[in-house]
């Protein structure tokens, strides 16, 4: 997994114009631009998709509004802060990427051979977005060094979730639950060396708990150690109700997802009138 961390001024300006205002000065600037140049302001709304599809090469059809924002003293200050933020993100990633890539490969049991452009915008915008049609992530979220692993794990989660969108299946909840188990829970636990299995969406909690015993088998946890993991993660089940499926420890994540989907009636109690087989694009 390779990350290219960049600042795209057009994307930064777009978010300043269309997200909640980061300051009173920017709010007043937006109001004035809308009052005086409503047509031009509205016309650049479509640019976001175009920027994300080619962040290094994007050139707007009409740069009038962009130039108006760029010439303001308020923007120049925000641009400087965004450049500083980019350097902070780069430094944190450079110091930790080896550890994250190694642990991620162990968990996936396959190489996540992908490259992403990480477009950083001002951290006060509080934005983390992934575009399903591109390999681009937009990040504008405060980075506190003592909480860097939370930040980096969330970035990795967004990337893996985006990659798993290539899996063609109607059972998205199962894929999303396994993504959380992998990244939000197990990867974060390994990185911080303390259980993070209390994290995740409430809507996925029941599915995750039903998958959890099989996930331990996938991780290669010996049945004799199940109790230790249950105590660690505060997720409990009757060990005697589960046959240990030893081959799960030898398959990769895509095969594991396929196994859970095919076994969803017995594991999750979900019936399907049609055969559900995953296909990776």
Task: Give, region by region, the residue ranges found by the protein language model.
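Pan-zinc metallopeptidase signature
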Residues: 206-281
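Short helix/strand-bridging catalytic loops that position acidic/His residues to coordinate divalent metals
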Residues: 136-145, 164-173
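Post-HExxH zinc-binding segment in Zn-dependent metallohydrolases
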Residues: 1-37, 170-229
């Amino acid at each position: 997994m390779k990350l290219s961390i960049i600042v795209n001024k057009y994307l930064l300006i777009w978010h300043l114009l269309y997200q909640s205002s980061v300051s009173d000065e920017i709010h007043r600037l937006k109001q004035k631009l809308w009052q005086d140049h409503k047509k031009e302001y509205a016309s650049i709304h479509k640019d976001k998709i175009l920027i994300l599809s080619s962040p290094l090469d994007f050139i707007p059809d009409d740069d009038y509004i962009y130039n108006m924002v760029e010439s303001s003293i308020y923007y120049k200050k925000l641009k400087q802060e965004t450049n500083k933020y980019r350097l902070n993100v780069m430094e944190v990633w450079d110091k930790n990427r080896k550890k994250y890539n190694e642990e991620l490969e162990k968990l996936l049991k396959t190489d996540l051979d992908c490259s992403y452009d990480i477009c950083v915008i001002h951290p006060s915008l509080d934005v983390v977005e992934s575009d399903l049609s591109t390999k681009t992530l937009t990040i504008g979220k405060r980075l506190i060094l003592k909480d860097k692993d939370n930040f980096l794990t969330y970035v990795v989660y967004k990337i893996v979730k985006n990659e798993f969108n290539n899996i063609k299946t109607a059972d998205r909840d199962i894929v999303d639950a396994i993504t959380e188990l992998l990244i939000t829970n197990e990867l974060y636990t390994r990185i911080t060396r303390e259980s993070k299995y209390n994290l995740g969406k409430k809507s996925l909690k029941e599915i995750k708990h039903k998958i959890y015993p099989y996930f331990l088998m996938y991780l290669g946890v010996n049945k004799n150690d199940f109790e230790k993991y249950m105590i660690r993660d505060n997720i409990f089940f009757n060990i005697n109700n589960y046959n240990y499926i030893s081959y799960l420890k030898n398959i990769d994540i895509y095969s594991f997802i396929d196994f859970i989907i095919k076994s969803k009636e017995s594991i999750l109690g979900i019936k399907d009138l049609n055969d559900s087989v995953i296909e990776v694009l």
